[in-house]
A protein has these predicted regions:
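Intrinsically disordered, low-complexity acidic/proline-rich regions
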Residues: 1-2, 17
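P-loop NTPase nucleotide-binding core
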Residues: 12-13, 17-19, 25-179, 234-265
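A generic structural motif
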Residues: 50, 215-223, 247
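Conserved Walker B catalytic segment
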Residues: 153-221, 231-234
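An acidic- and aromatic-residue-enriched active-site/binding cleft used to recognize and process polar
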Residues: 24-26, 56-59, 190-200, 220-225, ...
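Pre-Walker A adenine-sensing motif
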Residues: 4-12
Length: 265
């Protein structure tokens, strides 16, 4: 167990500030972070924050040369994958919580989502249909990213999916309005594997956005394992919006001590 574990849990979830949580990538860290879902669940009481835990949240690092690839497309696929991943989990947990009259409550959200629907696809009517379409889009971007960077395909067409794009900020804002939710979603991202640099920047874009009243990104990583703190536009996160840091263990102090060592020639 971590020292002051209960204090850490409250500090993480009872403030809407975006956070970087520094700690060794251990089973203990994952179990601690996952326990936040049980403490801050999706319930019919919409006055408290909701924790959503992800240990797989980005597109994988593919060791291949991307200098001839469309960088804008890679950023787009990374952003949309993360957006559909988070939205899918929100809807899945909402359906599982057995809300009454869910289709009626989310009717406005479904209507707004239909505006961005590919017109060659059927209109979305039910929450379960919306979740299915979100999952299809999520998987589409994951698979096509890998195929594109590996040269299996030369272009990515979104004609075959009903929902090619999702504004996550709009989705969560409208979801809260429909459900009369007064708090926010704490998106707990447990970095346990190597990510595409584009996915790292997609996360940074959300942290750099002023959306933490609705979506608060909380990244758990080893101190030297987050590839960059730059957003997709090249600017640093803190140049747009500040974030907090939490030390789960002694890893950050050990990292800082290492940085202070003199260079050995």
């Amino acid at each position: 167990m971590y020292k002051n574990e209960e204090y850490l849990k409250r500090t993480i979830m009872e403030q809407s500030r975006h956070l970087f949580m520094y700690g060794y990538a251990t089973k203990e860290r994952s179990e601690f972070l996952q326990s936040l879902e049980a403490l801050y669940p999706m319930t019919n009481n919409h006055s408290k924050p909701v924790a959503l835990y992800f240990d797989l949240f980005g597109l994988p690092r593919v060791e291949t040369d991307i200098k001839n690839k469309d960088i804008y497309m890679l950023h787009t696929m990374s952003r949309e994958y993360l957006s559909f991943l988070i939205a899918s989990e929100i809807l899945a947990k909402t359906i599982k919580s057995s809300e009454n009259n869910l289709d009626d409550k989310l009717a406005r959200l479904i209507k707004l989502t239909n505006i961005g629907r590919n017109q060659n696809h059927d209109k979305i009517t039910y929450t379960t249909d919306l979740l299915e379409k979100f999952k299809i889009s999520r998987d589409f971007y994951y698979e096509n990213y890998i195929n594109y960077v590996n040269g299996v395909i030369g272009n990515v067409s979104t004609d075959d999916i009903a929902l090619p794009f999702l504004n996550l900020e709009m989705f969560v804002s409208q979801y809260k309005r429909c459900m009369d939710m007064k708090s926010y979603f704490g998106i707990v991202l447990d970095k346990k594997s190597q990510l595409s640099s584009f996915s790292v920047q997609a996360v940074n874009n959300f942290i750099g956005a002023r959306i933490n009243g609705d979506i608060s990104i909380k990244v758990a990583t080893e101190p030297d394992d987050w590839e960059t703190y730059h957003c997709a536009n090249g600017g640093l996160i803190e140049g747009v919006h500040d974030y907090g840091t939490i030390e789960l263990d002694e890893s950050y102090r050990a990292y800082a001590k290492k940085l202070r060592r003199p260079i050995q020639y």
